């Protein structure tokens, strides 16, 4: 049966990628349908109850700067907030929040249900409708045919999902949810390059059976941080601490005793797990010299006693899980509410995607989230927003948009995926970005909100707040540059207190703010300083720009130097065997991967700087023959 309504964009899946994709497409004015197997699980946090962290918090801020929901929902559902790396430079500082699962999910669903241009429908998708090499819609379990111009697949771990506990396994998308077996088979039938990955989760514990008195308490930060640029601490519900304990030699012996029944160590699981979120059995194998590992006990919410023991993800048999949990200090009488498990699932080689996250093989079909080989809510949300926005642009027959590596962590994420592919679940870190001083959490709006506004992703409220912030920063910067502090007009004791020494001459306030030891707040305590700005976001920007301007300028110059070759377009139908001087290995890799730009080509493993030079020569030669200049990205 054909559904009566036709849509511009269909989103398959209601996790973190799917919800951001649906909201983005609808914000851009496209008639959007979100299909999910269960409306009750929209925005569900399937694994740990936290958002953000190193690199991940940066992605959340970028999603927020583009009008996305994740940061705002975290502000409404966050029960503990911390700034990680607070003692380090601004490039690597990152926000992390524990979230109440129920409140977070409710905040996401409320946004979905109240978003104009967005329809929700509860049905699992079994098939994709193709017309030649173009997508035309989807077919659900009931045989309902939904037609659309573009489709975004955000299937998470559901594609041929297989849950493992010990040597027992069963088909599931996650514990308690059915897998997408028919859809997985259909995608493989189409011939897209597939592989298997795995991820895992720890057993959940009843907090009433935990002895917190023998553990270290880990409170949140004060004053309490916020995630969204439009957020405030008043939005946060009650705040709770986390607790820290450790595994021990007894724990490790118990784990070793069960390895002969581990699906990972007996070869039952084929998929590769995440390097940076390993199972506890993987930890004791990889770090055999360590006699203990940290375990963070994280509350799942304000209205439940359920605790998430971060650090002991496992797929060992339940009897081993029971023993290992009870061997940990403070958990001697712990009651397990849900067993830990591993889940194995299909993913598709992201080198088969364009920078827009559209598949190269099928026009109008976009992938986002774990289907692309990533791990993490934040990575999924960022991809979802980008895929949803580009699906909306595709439906309008407009050019695709994506941020570059020097513009956003989202740009780094996508570029890494489509040029290098994945051999294990991909997690974002600040170390993956060459220009991380430019890509700070605090300036995500400065980098992306204007682009989001042009795309139609950013509403009037956010845009007006952003403009006010920009104007306040510019106004105060000018004031700091023209306001001077004269040492004769300030008591010596106060100068000593603020600057650690006496000033020898007159300085502008901006010059003084550039000093590492001088804060904006301390500067305003001087009698000639004036009132200053009250907005903490404005204050933060003023201080960072003053102190790091030299480094930022040098990085900007480096980016400009690289842009010329970085952005040269490569034709997707180019035959690299025709490029004189390229090795057979490089020819094969380029013909297989079909990079879109010279920059992408240079980041493919095995493609040397010499090979890039040959490509540039080849392009210029062809360009001269054609009588025009090489096409460059605008």
UniProtKB/Swiss-Prot annotation:
Protein residues bound to NAD(+): 273-287
Subcellular compartments: Cytoplasm
Keyword tRNA processing appears in the UniProt entry: yes
Membrane-crossing residue ranges in chain numbering: none
GN (gene name): mnmG
Recorded family membership: Belongs to the MnmG family.
Keyword tRNA processing assigned: yes
Pfam families from the UniProt entry: GIDA, GIDA_C_1st, SAM_GIDA_C
Coiled coil: none
InterPro entries: FAD/NAD-bd_sf, GIDA_C_N, MnmG, MnmG-rel, MnmG-rel_CS, MnmG_C, MnmG_C_subdom, MnmG_C_subdom_sf
Subunit record text: Homodimer. Heterotetramer of two MnmE and two MnmG subunits.
GO cellular component assignments: cytosol
A GO molecular-function descriptor: flavin adenine dinucleotide binding
Organism: Methylobacillus flagellatus (strain ATCC 51484 / DSM 6875 / VKM B-1610 / KT)
Protein's recorded name: tRNA uridine 5-carboxymethylaminomethyl modification enzyme MnmG
GO annotation terms (biological process): tRNA methylation; tRNA wobble uridine modification
Amino-acid positions noted as binding FAD in the UniProt annotation, renumbered to this chain: 13-18
Cofactors named for this entry: FAD
